Amino acid sequence: MKVDINAVKELRNLTGAGVGDCKEALNSCGGDIEKAKNYLREQGIAKAYKKSTKDVSDGLVAVHVNGNQGAILEVNSETDFVARNEKFQKLVLNLVSLANQYAVEDIEDFLKHEYVSGTSIHDEIMTNIAVIGENIHLNKIGYLSVNAGVVGGYIHSPVVNNLGKIGAIVALESTADNDKLNVLARQIAMHIVAARPEALSVDLLDKDILDKEREIIKKQVDQLNKPVSVAERIIDGRIAKFYQDVVLLEQIFVMDNQLTISELIKKKESELGASINLVGYKLFVISK
């Protein structure tokens, strides 16, 4: 049968599928656009499952903050070309908004929730794989909230608002003015992106990481042949420097090298007249 070009255009606008696929679908469904939509979906998901095994090494990080809660997620694609695709970017922004709405971090649970189109999030990702033509993988989700205070976020060098290759969210618990807390939270999120800490506090630093570093430092100091008391002071000093490199609260604030992050918070507590507790952060990076 001869396919109506206007029907092809309408089907393409509705699905994002290629002209050839739209013609094939309309031919197979007798020109019925609704049936053709379902046909494309069935064919597309079958193709998508084949593509979903391909390696993904690029993608985008997205941030969505809303008052006292916020979400961050990483969605991977095969190439930077797709990461710059408007349809892919819209998908990622919708996903991070839904992650914030559903307040979840578990990916399997999240994929079962409803997408804005009414389908499951899992099925929507599969549909986008079929339409875009590359594997798309939801790699990580982070979510933070506080009863009183704010969650702030930052994306470095965004490709569009709230989308980029590296981003962070920060939760500050406080009864201080939210507008001023938001400024502080964003500054700390910017610091996190620049300094890339591995833990919030010394107590939360992975014991294996600390033990390995202490062993390396001890071997270095042993070679100096110093008295035990001197060697112990050198080791303590180097461990303190290590904390300053990898622990957020011990790091030197990138916007003021006279303050650590802990000291910055104490300074803001004095200025705002309320205690401020940095309860958590999430840092996601697209790394090839």
UniProtKB/Swiss-Prot annotation:
What the protein does comes down to: Associates with the EF-Tu.GDP complex and induces the exchange of GDP to GTP. It remains bound to the aminoacyl-tRNA.EF-Tu.GTP complex up to the GTP hydrolysis stage on the ribosome.
What organism, scientifically named, is this protein from?
Ehrlichia chaffeensis (strain ATCC CRL-10679 / Arkansas)
Gene Ontology cellular-component terms for this entry are: cytoplasm
User: Which molecular-function annotation in GO is an example for this chain?
Assistant: translation elongation factor activity
Question: Which domain of life does the UniProt lineage start with?
Answer: Bacteria
Broad class of where this protein is predominantly found: cytoplasm
**Subcellular location field:** Cytoplasm
Keywords in alphabetical order: Cytoplasm, Elongation factor, Protein biosynthesis
Q: Which family does it belong to?
A: Belongs to the EF-Ts family.
Q: Which InterPro entries match?
A: EF-Ts_dimer_sf, Transl_elong_EFTs/EF1B, Transl_elong_EFTs/EF1B_dimer, Transl_elong_Ts_CS, UBA-like_sf
Q: Where is this region: Involved in Mg(2+) ion dislocation from EF-Tu?
A: 79-82
Protein name, as recorded? Elongation factor Ts
State the PROSITE patterns in the record: EF_TS_1, EF_TS_2
State the NCBIfam families in the record.
tsf (TIGR00116)
